[in-house]
Amino acid sequence: MGKIIGIDLGTTNSCVAIMDGMQARVLENAEGDRTTPSIIAYTQDGETLVGQPAKRQAVTNPQNTLFAIKRLIGRRFQDEEVQRDVSIMPYKIIEADNGDAWLDVKGQKMAPPQISAEVLKKMKKTAEDYLGEPVTEAVITVPAYFNDAQRQATKDAGRIAGLEVKRIINEPTAAALAYGLDKEVGNRTIAVYDLGGGTFDISIIEIDEVDGEKTFEVLATNGDTHLGGEDFDTRLINYLVDEFKKDQGIDLRNDPLAMQRLKEAAEKAKIELSSAQQTDVNLPYITADATGPKHMNIKVTRAKLESLVEDLVNRSIEPLKVALQDAGLSVSDINDVILVGGQTRMPMVQKKVAEFFGKEPRKDVNPDEAVAIGAAVQGGVLTGDVKDVLLLDVTPLSLGIETMGGVMTPLISKNTTIPTKHSQVFSTAEDNQSAVTIHVLQGERKRASDNKSLGQFNLDGINPAPRGMPQIEVTFDIDADGILHVSAKDKNSGKEQKITIKASSGLNEEEIQKMVRDAEANAESDRKFEELVQTRNQGDHLLHSTRKQVEEAGDKLPADDKTAIESALSALETALKGEDKAAIEAKMQELAQVSQKLMEIAQQQHAQQQAGSADASANNAKDDDVVDAEFEEVKDKK
């Protein structure tokens, strides 16, 4: 059985790890970095760039450089959070035919899972390069507060990338695995505060140890899937734009190029202010008007940044209270607080969390790598390489169906340990009703329409009977990935209908298969491109070396041969500008054929040079022999 790799598919950065013996190891990508920016760029010449190369060209290609795609995955276009992003993102977010939020890239409609798959492919390639063998299976992490649609979309992204997703696990739970695996014996209750690039989670987790087996049980989880470092960046960007407008009277929001430069500068300034008290945002030639070029130079202090984002940090505190309440615990019951996600490096975040829990958070967990390490550990558990570890996760939101009067009736409450199965008997609302519609919902609101609709299906063929008489058993079954399977059965007729919730929209099987085929075709075209580049390099080398040999041969090369070679060189040069590998190879072959006389001359010259150097060596050797002989004689006399 091959390795199951662990992937932290992050909003801002992604990370991949594997189990190396009993230790989890984070792998470095082709650029030598342990994390990869979750950025994908589609260039003008049709190339797809992922990670650092995509980030580097973002300034010159803002509309086709996609970042923070995780904020859109599994979401509807009309969602309030998506509408917020529509107005601030430099790329184009559109409504798909099924109502989902998709993207328009150079006139082509693309689904978020399709784009996230590019990042997963890079993670897969990183692992394959390290292991030297194909990788087909992965454990991928998601925010604990992701709903069913978002989890399903993440699984779809894995499939498009050519990975069988063996398990979807929650990010805070993965971080707890990374933290707890090598810690002291004994029972502990920990709080994992995970503030990443685009999402926020809090999980209360109990680690129990019985006879050497560690059980990681999630007691409660809460969060906000649209709160993260990107929002902190946006606050700082808006402040800088407003300051520049006050100073210069120019609104940079209408200039995508300037906004992309500003985004990079704001992110850099935010990071610097975690260790420094103030920083300069200095962007020369940010824009220009009739009077000439304009430069931005604005001082930002840590206090200013904190005043801009204080409400965002406070927004993360309310879910902490709810999670503790749901777990039936108080602050004093928490033994350790773990911070995960890059945004937790901000001193203000650390201070607020320490104030809430009454203790300093642990500093021995790497906030960027813990989640991927935990995913790799879970991969090890699934392959049997890691023993004596049991993971008990929970479903983050209640699941139920719509009943008479538009009410949400829960079948599975939030924070129920998964996998789980629950059945409940319902009946008809009207006399002689022959069919019922099962409308599946996820959320905590009483009114059905206020919750997330996951899908609906009909159960037909109910025998005519007075209202309230038929017995329809609805069963909810959540698997270990937190994905829901629903069935409805008429107990009288035995008729049954089943559905695996694919979200009310999401990608259907046909779309996923098409994207998988596209990804495979891209892999094939990437391979062909690589071969073309290699052939081009060989052609360039042949061009250069032949020209050099013609020069060295001088008058020794007959005029006819020289003309034929010059013609073949010119033909090869033209072929090298094209995209046809076979044409380049053919012209290289032609050049080799007409260059036979040239090769002979080159070999003769080479032989003469060698003979000349051999004579010189022989003469030197004679002189050396005399010295050696004298030296030898001296030695003998001793």
From Swiss-Prot:
The keyword Phosphoprotein applies. Induction: By stress conditions e.g. heat shock. Coiled coil: none annotated. One of its GO terms (molecular function) is ATP-dependent protein folding chaperone. Residues 603-620 have a biased composition (Low complexity). Residues 603-638 are annotated as: Disordered. Signal peptide: none annotated. The modification Phosphothreonine is found at T199. Gene3D superfamilies: 1.20.1270.10, 3.30.420.40, Actin, Chain A, domain 4, Substrate Binding Domain Of DNAk, Chain A, domain 1. Keywords: ATP-binding, Chaperone, Nucleotide-binding, Phosphoprotein, Stress response. The keyword RNA-binding does not apply. Belongs to the heat shock protein 70 family. This is Chaperone protein DnaK. The lineage of its organism: Bacteria, Pseudomonadati, Pseudomonadota, Gammaproteobacteria, Enterobacterales.
